[in-house]
């Protein structure tokens, strides 16, 4: 989910492809060297077998079903088709120079080849030029990142201009990918033109495999620089001066907090996600009020939300059946977002259960887990209407917390690059962005912490000085996580003081079930949602007395047997996370670590072709 310069890639090998109009060349071979092994290929040879390795996933291995997981992440595309798209951009830039003023912002151009270009970005000053008799061509490519959801290539041309090509993995159905790409580009466009944020310029995109690239893609500006993550040291020890460690941490926190503040500036007319007007013709309503720039007035619309939880692994459901849960939602009904999230997940679990019971499921999942998921998500939907009293006066400036604001799901130092020449931060990868009330927007993952809070080790922990070093280390970890979150919330108060109530402890407890739902990564994590619902039940009477919720009694009833069953299941899940390496990442591990564990005999292949910990290692 980031785009980085080759110098910013962590110490892993990169694949590099040199393209020739005359030679057949080589493709990369994975190597421990930081220098890529070059491979040459002929541009017109679409069937060159040497290219195959260039498109295969190589940054990690799954302990189970590795072959199938990697096949889903093959990003084979047409080099010749990509070259034609880039060449056409240069032709467009010449025409744009003739017909557009420097400040002109025309609508996106929907082209016959089923790509879309953004004319205000496709300018000679942005993409360069070649000699009049010379045709633009790709001269080399490098794979610079293999992320969770897409792969990123750096494309170099004979115009001495580099581009970034982003290709999503085929993990979802075509409709999901199309909606996701349309919204992502429109959101980046909005962030650039309306908010003035530093983001990569998008030149062209295609939402399906019918375009010349033969893959959904985004072609955007390449920014040379250093990832902000390089400066993030979350376990930094407190300095003796009591200040310099905060300065170091805030050097990362503050730029991201300022991005968040800019994203929250505009109050929208509905909840959902942004699209270009032509990509969402269902609505004629402007995305927001008060626009004075005529070229921006009808540029964007609010359509179905592309928040990841609403689309991820939902292909079991018919797309038309899914759409009823995706919004857009009226500005007067913010809690419908929570309700629809629960209803959609419950319906998806029912559909999956039906396939399992009919012995037609392509996945291995226990019936009991799916049945419990259905119950949990139905519970979330049932609680939703009463979850927050939107008229309460107990929370200061509640009306501000309920207004529709842009939410970026990956505010993270891994998603920010400091430009090489001036260290200006650029925010990357807007995939999954949505518009929802700030009261439902969770703390960014890099600073989020929901464990025991320790603000001062010696004052808060009795006998801390006399403890064993191992016990001190655990408490110091909690302290540093608490400290980092506090620094984030302090920055929030500096940059968005009208929204500081969003991090009040009661608000966090109220939104915890929803946050657990949108952050769920595995089937068993429904237990975290149920745990949040049970915790909410304990404090509901207090919240009701203070008019924070809409019902005097908690909408859910739990028997002692149900509470015990849940506690046992949650404990078993936590034990699994401890006893099974990489359970939290669904069995995925970085490739260099996997190679070392196999070479050391710690991981061995079983009769099914999966990798397990060696029995001798257990002994």
Curated annotation (Swiss-Prot):
InterPro entries from the UniProt entry: Kinase-like_dom_sf, Mito_inheritance_9
Top-level division of the source organism's lineage: Eukaryota
Location relative to the cell: Mitochondrion
Transit sequence range: 1-31
TM stretches of this protein: none
Alphabetically ordered keywords of this record: Mitochondrion, Transit peptide
GO cellular component assignments: mitochondrion
PANTHER family with a match to the protein in the record: ALTERED INHERITANCE OF MITOCHONDRIA PROTEIN 9, MITOCHONDRIAL
Family: Belongs to the AIM9 family.
Full protein name: Altered inheritance of mitochondria protein 9, mitochondrial
Organism in which the protein naturally occurs: Kluyveromyces lactis (strain ATCC 8585 / CBS 2359 / DSM 70799 / NBRC 1267 / NRRL Y-1140 / WM37)
